[in-house]
């Protein structure tokens, strides 16, 4: 009887084994499937070679893993079904009835179909992002319309391609991308992002943060509580029920140019006052500016985040169109430039162009006041060749780009905006080209550090919902093949890889 039971058990075990036991897809099978996928992807994304990098068979299930190139395809429900049919037809006969999953970028291709194109059932299965921040970084208090769904109060980190940079090996400033049709990608992509994409996102309720200067205005005036080199800006305080006081380190504009490692947000002081409720006499900080010409000017404010900071610091911008009022959440974003908007300003004296009051929904908290930046200006970060690349016969000097700041890459804006060297120069000043594209991911980490997005990391506490790079990938290849528009996204919480396009 025992022998009979053992025989039955072994018979059942053998019957459960797959018919392909001991077999894998041959290299010929992999190559054939890779070729099919490459041809499919090439219809939409030229140059994105696709290959099978892994095969896993368990029971009657098969997982095929493709490289990152497959993820660039714009998947739709019907195309996903067609791709599975094409791959299944290329499998050996004995494997075609297996449950097949095709993976790329760590996900099944069906999960890469955008939500609007999915069925109602598929949408319910998706876990979407939720913003747990009580209030966003900036709110427009007198906006004619305030969205309450969709992108409302979302924080989007967005950058408009490349920018002018200092080439260490050639000892000169240059564009990063190829010159084509009287422009280059460093400039061209901004013509989509700055006048169209950013306002569209902002009008939909999002707070958009950029690692490059967004203002094409070449005039820049800095008004600050600390004396500096800019005589066109002025600061004054008006005391109500509660007095202003010093609140530690802040911004000061003491230099015409900045070397790597020099931080204007660590060279001055910041002012603070406790908040009061309705009915109490308010204290105010007032910034004024003398402008050489009328025009549109971006207005940035700065402050220091404290443990008891107010989440509704109330700013008013006076301009030719009247007044615009904002509430800035000072519990996040301290120690950098925070964009309020772009406004038409008059030539000459603009008194009280920005005003901050200590009136708040809750008394007893703190608002802080530091510098205000008006306009984009010219680049003020000076660069030179690093010691390891210098030659005895070379002539070296520190020099700025000589271009408006909006033309420059992120590496230089991030220094002017108060970020640490580990953010803007991960290559430790040896390679500005790599610093520029790598710094953008580190900037997102620095923004989100300390928020619910990255609670275990130090940073500015801004809960970034999305980071998006907008590129045209302008250029040519051999055979006169052109390269087209490309969006780069990163799906991990924290960027740690040295590879700029590792989208694990």
Model features per residue range: what roles?
Residues 320-348:
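Extracellular carbohydrate recognition and processing domains
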Residues 495-504:
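Single conserved hydrophobic/aromatic residue that forms the stacking wall/gate
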Residues 355-364:
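Short beta-strand-plus-loop segments that form exposed binding edges in beta-rich domains
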Residues 152-241, 382-481:
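Catalytic-core regions of hydrolytic enzymes
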Residues 22-59:
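N-proximal, solvent-exposed amphipathic alpha-helical segments enriched in charged/polar residues
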Residues 283-307:
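A short beta-strand element within beta-rich, extracytoplasmic domains
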């Amino acid at each position: 009887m025992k022998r009979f039971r053992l025989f039955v058990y072994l018979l059942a075990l053998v019957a459960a084994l797959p018919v392909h036991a001991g077999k894998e897809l041959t290299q010929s099978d992999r190559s054939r499937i890779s070729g099919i996928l490459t041809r499919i992807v090439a219809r939409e994304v030229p140059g994105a070679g696709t290959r099978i990098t892994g095969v896993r068979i368990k029971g009657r299930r098969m997982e095929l893993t493709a490289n990152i190139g497959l993820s660039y395809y714009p998947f739709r429900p019907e195309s996903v079904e067609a791709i599975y049919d094409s791959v299944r037809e290329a499998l050996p006969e004995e494997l075609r009835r297996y449950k097949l999953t095709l993976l790329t970028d760590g996900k099944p291709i069906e999960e890469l179909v955008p939500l609007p194109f999915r069925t109602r059932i598929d949408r319910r299965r998706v876990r979407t992002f939720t913003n747990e921040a009580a209030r966003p970084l900036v709110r427009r208090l007198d906006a004619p319309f305030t969205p309450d769904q969709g992108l409302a109060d979302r924080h989007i980190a967005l950058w408009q391609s490349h920018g002018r940079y200092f080439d260490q090996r050639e000892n000169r400033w240059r564009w990063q991308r190829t010159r084509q049709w009287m422009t280059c990608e460093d400039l061209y992509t901004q013509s989509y992002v700055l006048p169209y994409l950013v306002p569209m996102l902002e009008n939909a309720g999002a707070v958009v943060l950029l690692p490059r200067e967004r203002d094409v205005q070449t005039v820049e005036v800095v008004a600050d509580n600390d004396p500096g080199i800019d005589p066109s800006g002025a600061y004054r305080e008006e005391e109500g029920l509660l007095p202003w006081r010093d609140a530690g380190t802040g911004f000061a504009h003491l230099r015409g140019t900045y070397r790597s490692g020099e931080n204007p947000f660590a060279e001055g002081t910041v002012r603070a006052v406790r908040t009061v409720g309705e009915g109490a006499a308010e204290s105010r900080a007032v910034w004024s500016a003398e402008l050489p010409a009328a025009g549109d000017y971006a207005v940035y404010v700065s402050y220091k985040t404290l443990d008891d900071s107010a989440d509704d610091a109330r700013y008013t911008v006076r301009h030719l169109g009247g007044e615009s009022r904002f509430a800035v959440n000072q519990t996040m974003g301290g120690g950098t430039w925070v964009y309020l908007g772009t406004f038409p300003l008059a030539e000459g004296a603009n008194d009280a162009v920005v005003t901050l009051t200590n009136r708040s929904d809750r008394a007893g908290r703190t608002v802080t006041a530091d510098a205000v930046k008006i306009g984009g200006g010219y680049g003020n970060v000076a660069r030179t060749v690093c010691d390891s690349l210098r030659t005895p016969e070379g002539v070296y000097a520190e020099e700025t780009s000589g271009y408006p700041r909006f033309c420059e890459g992120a590496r230089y804006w991030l220094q002017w905006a108060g970020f640490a060297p580990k953010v803007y120069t991960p290559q430790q000043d040896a390679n500005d080209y790599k610093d520029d594209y790598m710094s953008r991911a580190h900037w997102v980490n620095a923004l989100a550090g300390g928020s619910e997005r990255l609670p275990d990391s130090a940073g500015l506490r801004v809960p970034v919902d999305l980071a998006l790079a907008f590129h045209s990938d302008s250029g040519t290849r051999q055979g006169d093949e052109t390269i087209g528009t490309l969006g780069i996204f990163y799906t991990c919480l924290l960027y740690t890889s040295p590879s700029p396009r590792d989208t694990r």
